[in-house]
């Protein structure tokens, strides 16, 4: 018996787009492309297109749906542009275009393009169909086509009228755009229906098809069950008791029952049924063929109007009999037996054919699983079966007594018949009417006879038997024996072993319902959301319908190893036969692989792989369809025969999935783990080479596809146009950003000037107002080149006095920013003491700047001069923290305005190397800065303490003043005061 889910079928919402396209397209060659990704990559191609183009499915995946990879030198450029425009505008169109197969053979194709929409009416896919029309086009003239002259003339004659092409596209001319959805099916030659949408939806049925599990059909089945029992009761009764249909009311009732059963036949032609795989079959053609092959003939024979035909045959006899008012009515008296035997003929034949109506019980048999779904109905049905058996036995028991009570030879009544004994017991003996009809009359009434017959059969079936009605003749005794045998069997089976029957017949069903109850309790206990709960329940029902509650692993464990391997090979035969990678595998290798395979059943919406999850299995799709989603876009649709996962045999590391793999329909996957596959490949070395060479993954989850969405491209284009149309941003001259960039530009110019000054060192001269370097005796001093930053803001001139070091007393230095302490005045004396932190910044700045200059080879040694004269007109910036010294002159202009006589002779051969600041100096500076920061922090803490004390004192004074003042004074104090008044108040306090 099947459980409720199996009877109902698999009715969860699923995306059957791929199955519908494949079913409707028949032998059409087509590909599906994603309409939301740039270049519209191919996400699915059927076997027909692969065979037509010569490419494997894995080779065309992710290539453009325009099939640009099949273009060649003879492909028309205008047609290529029209194809691209059709994709860009999401239009339906058809083209004749020349393309090239994988072996570069030119082929003429009739290409038809149609957009596929989802539930939001958004184009998500493109369906492109290809028809080979090379035979109807002029052969392509090249070196490989010599000798085709006759064929060329023939094809030119065929294509002159273009009649064949019109048959290929009866309603769509070349280049014609079709905008009406109703013509989509006609364009693509997929039938009269509109192309399905790419969305998840519940199984739909045509308007004239009835679901077998709907409320109406369930109610109708119960009505048919009741009428079937009505037929099973009345047909044997009417045949045994030879009841004529002289009662118009009963004739009308029987006719209505016949009409209802005829209507049931019509409904069966429009009622869905459950297929062998658990799917709901709603195709009208399949429904009709299935019913015609199974129960149609039996149902038709059981519905013929035998009562109506019999009534017309006996109309004269019934009228004559009803016209005699002295006769006993047939409702109360048994019809004369002799008269019934004398009037045999067509009427008796049709009366006997009423038994054919018992074939209606077949309806109960084939729909028994509908009724036993309810526990109380099972017990009622069993009791009804027992009572129906007793009723049939009672009718047969009366027929035996009616046949033996009259002796045909002597025209007398047999005294040993049970009917004669019953007539004598109840006081209604039989009497012979010699003066009238000359027939036997009287006897027990029909009701008494039926009740007595049923009483006898029930006592016999239950093995009770009181003996007040007992068989006397041989036939009666034989029948009594048969009744007792049947009764013992029925009694023991139905009543004695009801519990055993339920356990044996419904063990799987009980286990199924127990599992469902456990799952329901679990979902209710943990308050699982409704959507997820429905998915869980649907998955359990679908899995049970596929496995029928059989634990495959448990069964395989019972079998020995050799038998278990044979069973596994049989279970995975589809994978081994469909994929060429297993063709060269030996029997032992196949058996080893089959032992490692696992069968996985997936419900619609299940995620087989999540993005970022480890890919540790190789999956073969046996049935159903799946979609691969990367960045919320469908990048591939996988169907029967596809393989996805990772190339474990080529990669040493475990891969992470770059996309989600989600089931669109109910799917059956054959999965093998990574470690198990590698173990088999390591053992069977010869097979491993063939396997790695021939197995082509339809989609490799390790690789991430790089694409750009059309929506992103359009958005970027809109932003670019928006920026282009916007007015440029204008910053005022005194804007901080503009000043910052101006400072960077000036510093760059100063560095370039320093470099040029180093290169022109031989001609260097010092202009008026700059510091001069003199040459004294034989001692030479290194003069530092300064990088001077010039700002637009006016600077305060600061006089500078060159300080002589102990080592070089007669030399002056051109001071760099921050290199020396500058006094506020130009006179002699010591420089004011500067902060250690400023000196540390100056030292670091000098170290970095001088190193850069040294690396750029822009620092040149300056020769010694004989005299030191003049002063450098240096300026200090008005910045309070930078301390950068500025000059009105630039180093690249040094020496240009000086006269030759003012210049000192340059000793080119005397060079002084530059040495950066020693590390000990930096360390000392850092320690000094650290000590100074500690002192500053202590000073700040002391100031904060003083401020807190002052605030506390102020609060205390305010509190005391408030407590000592009147409300009027408080009101006056609360008024706003000027800053001067506030200072006066606080000062006074």
Curated annotation (Swiss-Prot):
<dbReference type="GO" id="GO:0042127">
    <property type="term" value="P:regulation of cell population proliferation"/>
</dbReference>
<dbReference type="GO" id="GO:0071805">
    <property type="term" value="P:potassium ion transmembrane transport"/>
</dbReference>
<feature type="modified residue" description="Phosphoserine">
    <location>
        <position position="981"/>
    </location>
</feature>
<protein>
    <recommendedName>
        <fullName>Voltage-gated delayed rectifier potassium channel KCNH1</fullName>
    </recommendedName>
</protein>
<feature type="transmembrane region" description="Helical; Name=Segment S6">
    <location>
        <begin position="478"/>
        <end position="498"/>
    </location>
</feature>
<keyword id="KW-0628">Postsynaptic cell membrane</keyword>
<dbReference type="Pfam" id="PF00027">
    <property type="entry name" value="cNMP_binding"/>
</dbReference>
<feature type="transmembrane region" description="Helical; Name=Segment S2">
    <location>
        <begin position="249"/>
        <end position="269"/>
    </location>
</feature>
<dbReference type="InterPro" id="IPR035965">
    <property type="entry name" value="PAS-like_dom_sf"/>
</dbReference>
<feature type="topological domain" description="Cytoplasmic">
    <location>
        <begin position="270"/>
        <end position="290"/>
    </location>
</feature>
<keyword id="KW-0225">Disease variant</keyword>
<dbReference type="GO" id="GO:0008076">
    <property type="term" value="C:voltage-gated potassium channel complex"/>
</dbReference>
<comment type="function">
    <text>Pore-forming (alpha) subunit of a voltage-gated delayed rectifier potassium channel that mediates outward-rectifying potassium currents which, on depolarization, reaches a steady-state level and do not inactivate. The activation kinetics depend on the prepulse potential and external divalent cation concentration. With negative prepulses, the current activation is delayed and slowed down several fold, whereas more positive prepulses speed up activation. The time course of activation is biphasic with a fast and a slowly activating current component.</text>
</comment>
<dbReference type="GO" id="GO:1902936">
    <property type="term" value="F:phosphatidylinositol bisphosphate binding"/>
</dbReference>
<dbReference type="InterPro" id="IPR014710">
    <property type="entry name" value="RmlC-like_jellyroll"/>
</dbReference>
<keyword id="KW-0597">Phosphoprotein</keyword>
<keyword id="KW-0112">Calmodulin-binding</keyword>
<keyword id="KW-0967">Endosome</keyword>
<feature type="intramembrane region" description="Pore-forming; Name=Segment H5">
    <location>
        <begin position="449"/>
        <end position="470"/>
    </location>
</feature>
<feature type="transmembrane region" description="Helical; Name=Segment S1">
    <location>
        <begin position="221"/>
        <end position="241"/>
    </location>
</feature>
<keyword id="KW-0407">Ion channel</keyword>
<dbReference type="GO" id="GO:0042734">
    <property type="term" value="C:presynaptic membrane"/>
</dbReference>
<dbReference type="Pfam" id="PF13426">
    <property type="entry name" value="PAS_9"/>
</dbReference>
<keyword id="KW-0991">Intellectual disability</keyword>
<dbReference type="GO" id="GO:0043231">
    <property type="term" value="C:intracellular membrane-bounded organelle"/>
</dbReference>
<feature type="topological domain" description="Cytoplasmic">
    <location>
        <begin position="1"/>
        <end position="220"/>
    </location>
</feature>
<keyword id="KW-1133">Transmembrane helix</keyword>
<keyword id="KW-1003">Cell membrane</keyword>
<dbReference type="InterPro" id="IPR003938">
    <property type="entry name" value="K_chnl_volt-dep_EAG/ELK/ERG"/>
</dbReference>
<keyword id="KW-0406">Ion transport</keyword>
<comment type="similarity">
    <text>Belongs to the potassium channel family. H (Eag) (TC 1.A.1.20) subfamily. Kv10.1/KCNH1 sub-subfamily.</text>
</comment>
<dbReference type="InterPro" id="IPR000595">
    <property type="entry name" value="cNMP-bd_dom"/>
</dbReference>
<dbReference type="GO" id="GO:0042391">
    <property type="term" value="P:regulation of membrane potential"/>
</dbReference>
<dbReference type="GO" id="GO:0098839">
    <property type="term" value="C:postsynaptic density membrane"/>
</dbReference>
<feature type="transmembrane region" description="Helical; Voltage-sensor; Name=Segment S4">
    <location>
        <begin position="346"/>
        <end position="368"/>
    </location>
</feature>
<dbReference type="GO" id="GO:0071277">
    <property type="term" value="P:cellular response to calcium ion"/>
</dbReference>
<dbReference type="InterPro" id="IPR005821">
    <property type="entry name" value="Ion_trans_dom"/>
</dbReference>
<dbReference type="GO" id="GO:0007520">
    <property type="term" value="P:myoblast fusion"/>
</dbReference>
<dbReference type="GO" id="GO:0030425">
    <property type="term" value="C:dendrite"/>
</dbReference>
<dbReference type="GO" id="GO:0030424">
    <property type="term" value="C:axon"/>
</dbReference>
<feature type="compositionally biased region" description="Basic and acidic residues">
    <location>
        <begin position="855"/>
        <end position="879"/>
    </location>
</feature>
<feature type="region of interest" description="Interaction with cyclic nucleotide-binding pocket">
    <location>
        <begin position="699"/>
        <end position="701"/>
    </location>
</feature>
